[in-house]
Regions:
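Beta-sandwich strand segments
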Residues: 1-7, 121-160
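Low-complexity/repetitive intrinsically disordered segments
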Residues: 1-13, 162-170
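Proline/serine/threonine-rich low-complexity linkers at boundaries of modular beta-sandwich domains
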Residues: 13-28, 166-170
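Extracellular acidic, Ser/Thr/Pro-rich low-complexity tracts
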Residues: 17, 35-39, 46-55, 66-68, ...
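Solvent-exposed loop/turn segments flanking beta-strands in beta-repeat/beta-sandwich domains
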Residues: 51-76, 108-109
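Solvent-exposed serine/threonine-rich low-complexity stretches and specific carbohydrate-binding patches
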Residues: 72-90
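Aromatic sugar-binding surface patches on proteins
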Residues: 88-100, 106
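Short glycine/proline/serine/threonine-rich loop/turn segments at secondary-structure transition edges
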Residues: 103-113, 122-124
């Protein structure tokens, strides 16, 4: 590794204007499926309504498990995952995704058991199926900045977002 002085001049610049710090995580307000059933080998479309206060929604991802596995003690055997395309040019607040069900996936009742959302300033929020806290709504997990202490706090609370279930048929 050799280092030597360059002839390029040092460049300095100043950023001006009003800045608004992005301290809040984005929020998912609704999740709706195109149908409550899907056949193996097909896909199931869904819409996620989400918003962010300053920088905008950056990324949304999800996981789904069979109901039995979501309620059971072991790790997932049947597991679906994916992400939602976020179009920054057309940020209407509604993001469309798709769950691809392969021919070998288990038939029966499934639940979207985990959603992650982040904004373009890397603030995130997770929504999880946590039956010990709520059997009807997702539990929201996120970090929140406390202006009084200057610290980030990790919080968990029941959200207003109802759990989403679907059935896979053969």
């Amino acid at each position: 590794y050799l280092q030597e002085e360059s002839d390029l001049p040092l460049v300095r610049f100043t950023v001006t204007g009003d800045t608004v710090p992005d301290k809040l995580s984005p929020v998912i307000t609704n999740l709706s499926l195109a149908s409550d059933t899907v056949a193996t080998g097909e896909s199931l479309a869904f819409d996620i309504e989400a918003s962010d206060d300053v920088s905008g929604v950056g990324h949304i991802s999800f996981n789904a498990r069979t109901e039995a596995e979501a309620n059971g003690p072991g790790g997932p055997v049947s597991y679906l995952h994916g992400s939602v395309h976020v179009d920054h040019e057309n940020d209407s607040g509604v993001f469309t995704g798709e769950i691809q069900v392969d021919t070998w996936d288990q038939t029966g009742d499934w639940i979207i058991n985990h959603l992650n959302i982040s904004d373009r300033a890397d603030k995130y929020k997770s929504y999880s199926y946590s039956p010990n806290i709520s059997e009807t709504h997702y539990v929201r997990s996120y970090s929140q900045y406390d202006n009084d202490t200057g610290q980030w706090n990790y919080l968990q609370e029941e959200s207003d977002l109802p759990l989403v279930r679907f059935t896979v048929t053969g």
